[in-house]
Design a protein with these regions (language model features):
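Zn-dependent metallo-beta-lactamase
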Residues: 2-42, 49-51, 251, 261-263
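Metallo-beta-lactamase
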Residues: 28, 99-173, 248-267
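Divalent metal-coordination and catalytic microenvironments
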Residues: 35, 46, 75, 83, ...
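Pre-active-site segment of Zn-dependent metallo-hydrolases
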Residues: 38-78, 82-89, 112, 142-157, ...
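Active-site environment of divalent metal-dependent phosphoester hydrolases
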Residues: 51-52, 78-82, 102-105, 123-126, ...
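Cap/insert and terminal regions of metallo-dependent hydrolase folds
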Residues: 70, 182-263
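Structural motif
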Residues: 41-43, 69-70, 131, 173-175, ...
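Short internal beta-strands
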Residues: 93-100, 226-231
């Protein structure tokens, strides 16, 4: 009897700490997301917001983001770096990225070294309490185009290798943000080893997977459970659509969740 009561008490304590183990995901368009974890940690991924044609105007006030604990940047292109510098300065958030790009950010003063987390593929890190992040491969390119704040002159700097991220929340839920990527064979390893619960996959084509390639990745490599299509429709070359993605998938076990920019999902 006492053992049973102890089990009930432990369940009540767990639920009080993380009510229903719920968490939220907000999409700003392109590849930009805000994750609010079960423990209240706020994580931004590729925060391209103020310059994003798909982000609703009401959400372009960066102050409205409130607390930010961590920013993850997949690679150095402007539509992924986005507002990283401003948000980091305003919030004091840690900023995690590949080690080489981290040096570029630090040396150019984009983000102070004291806020940077420079790491690399495979080895997991815990940048904030309760959140585990693993960097994985992405088939793309990376460079940092820096605009001098005084002269306005642009210069190009090393961006290291592009990446995707496996983000594991306090409740064990795993998100795979693929970054910008083409399809690659080791997606099979990502699916088998990390077993993501939710995948955020680019479908726009031209610079990344198109709907057919993304569908192949889902059905043949990742073994996806839930998929949110991203990185489409923001600029003219990104012609892939969720409808074409669904058609290319055919019969599949994956649940496709199509979000609207600004929308918040609760899991």
């Amino acid at each position: 009897m006492m053992r049973a009561l102890g089990g009930v008490l432990m369940l009540m304590i767990t639920c009080a700490a993380f009510p229903a183990l719920a968490w939220e995901l907000q999409w700003f368009g392109q590849s930009a997301f805000k994750v609010t974890s079960p423990g209240g940690k706020v994580i931004l991924i590729d925060p391209f917001i103020t310059g994003n044609p798909k982000t609703p105007e009401a959400l372009k006030d960066l102050a409205a983001l409130g607390r930010v604990d961590l920013i993850l940047v997949t690679h150095g292109h402007g539509d992924h770096v986005g507002d990283t510098a401003r948000i980091a300065a305003d919030s004091g958030a840690k900023v995690a990225m590949n080690a080489d790009m981290g040096h570029t950010f630090g040396n150019l003063g984009i983000v102070p070294y004291k806020q940077l987390i420079r790491f690399n593929k495979s080895g997991p890190i815990q940048p904030v309490e309760g959140i585990t992040v693993t960097m994985v491969h992405a088939e793309h390119s990376s460079e940092v185009v820096h605009t001098d704040p005084e002269s306005g002159a642009k210069s190009v700097h090393p961006g290291g290798e592009p990446a995707g991220y496996i983000v594991e929340l306090e409740n064990g839920f795993r998100i795979y943000h693929a970054g910008d990527t083409g399809v690659f064979a080791d997606m099979k390893f990502i699916g088998e080893y990390y077993r993501p619960d939710l995948e955020l996959l680019p479908i726009g084509g031209h610079f990344t997977m198109d709907p057919a390639h993304a569908a192949y990745a889902v059905n043949k490599l990742l073994g996806s459970r839930k998929v949110i299509p991203i990185h489409y429709g923001t600029f003219p070359p990104l012609k892939g659509t969720p409808e074409a993605f669904k058609q290319a998938l055919g019969e599949t076990r994956a649940e496709v969740i199509v979000m609207e920019p600004g929308q918040v999902l609760k899991f």
